[in-house]
């Protein structure tokens, strides 16, 4: 699963300032290598207006089902700390994808469980993402 581009962060997503909206840039790769227990890759997620820059290279799992891909892991926020993340995407070009690439990012403090960012705050982790990616962005899922 790979992707890159941008989206508009909706109101309520950035818990430190719920009224803040704006452009978020993202890039990610995640895949299993032969005989590997955990997937490998990198996830970058930056919300400039929120002064938030998240980077992860540690992954717990990757699950692909049709046009949907979800992976979970942990990384650092603004270069420090320990934060879990859950990234769920839909490849709009695949059967069942609906013609639009969609994206959900949830980031929370590993120690306290406090949510830092979730562009579908309050939704189940199993829900399909609803936020469309911006023009020129791309999400590609390959098995």
PLM features per residue range, with description:
Residues 1-92, 96-143:
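Mature soluble binding/inhibitory domains
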């Amino acid at each position: 699963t790979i992707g890159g581009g941008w989206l508009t962060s909706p109101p309520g997503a950035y818990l430190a300032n719920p009224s803040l909206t704006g452009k978020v840039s993202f890039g990610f790769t995640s895949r299993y290598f032969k005989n590997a227990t955990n997937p490998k890759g990198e996830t970058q997620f930056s919300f400039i207006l929120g002064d938030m820059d998240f980077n992860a290279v540690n992954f717990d799992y990757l699950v692909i089902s049709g046009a949907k891909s979800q992976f979970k892991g942990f990384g650092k926020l603004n270069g420090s700390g320990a934060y879990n993340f859950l990234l769920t995407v839909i490849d709009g070009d695949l059967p069942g994808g609906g013609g639009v690439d969609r994206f959900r990012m949830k980031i929370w403090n590993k120690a306290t469980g406090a949510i830092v960012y979730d562009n579908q705050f309050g939704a189940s982790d199993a829900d399909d993402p609803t936020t469309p990616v911006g023009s020129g962005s791309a999400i590609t899922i390959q098995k």
